[in-house]
Amino acid sequence: LLAEAIEDLGQASSRNESFDLYFNGDKDKWIAAAYTLKARINLVMKNYSTALSEAGMGISSSSGDMMYNPRSAQNGQANLFWEILNGSRSGDLGNAKQGQTSYLIDLLDPSHSDYRGNAKTNEEARHGYYSIDETSASGNTGVAMGTEPQPMLTFSENQLIKAEASARTAGFSSGLSELNAYRAWLQTGGRLNANHNNATKFKYDAYVEADFVGGGMENSDGL
């Protein structure tokens, strides 16, 4: 079905369409999104060569991301996380409950023992962005803010597919190059919104192979 959709879109023309909630009638962005979706499916199926090929034609910059863009911070039009917190289910959604935080938040938390930061990586800003205040919708300034867009298909996913698929098919160096391209995007602020885009709280310097050998900053235990 995706291949047929890509073929049909290839024969169409782009035109401004207000009813297209994602790409305003831009066929090239739709085609790229379809390729990213194909890459996602093939990666899950462990078809790494095909996944890499599809990702090569997928979303190539964050300007091509497929996002759900809330119309306003009002019920029925807002960020879906915010909708849950603002309704009768406040307290049911969050990543810090009863003194326990989610693994994602632990990985991003500079004060936690599971933190994955190092001399080349500072995740403080993303930790703030992805933290959810489960007690109040209005208390959220990041991923669960009422007007915060929500990703569906993105450059970041596409780039990380390229990183994994490249490493599995062409070797570590190829995968690392694609990973560093993703990190370079993070260094621009990535998906951080204005509340969390503070350059003093993030850093994503490029890795080198030595960082991953035994004793390197990403392999201190030599596994």
Indicate where each model-derived feature is located.
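Structural signature of alpha-solenoid helical repeat junctions
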Residues: 23-26, 30, 147, 154
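Hydrophobic-face positions in mid-chain alpha helices that act as interaction patches
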Residues: 2, 46-159, 178-180, 185-223
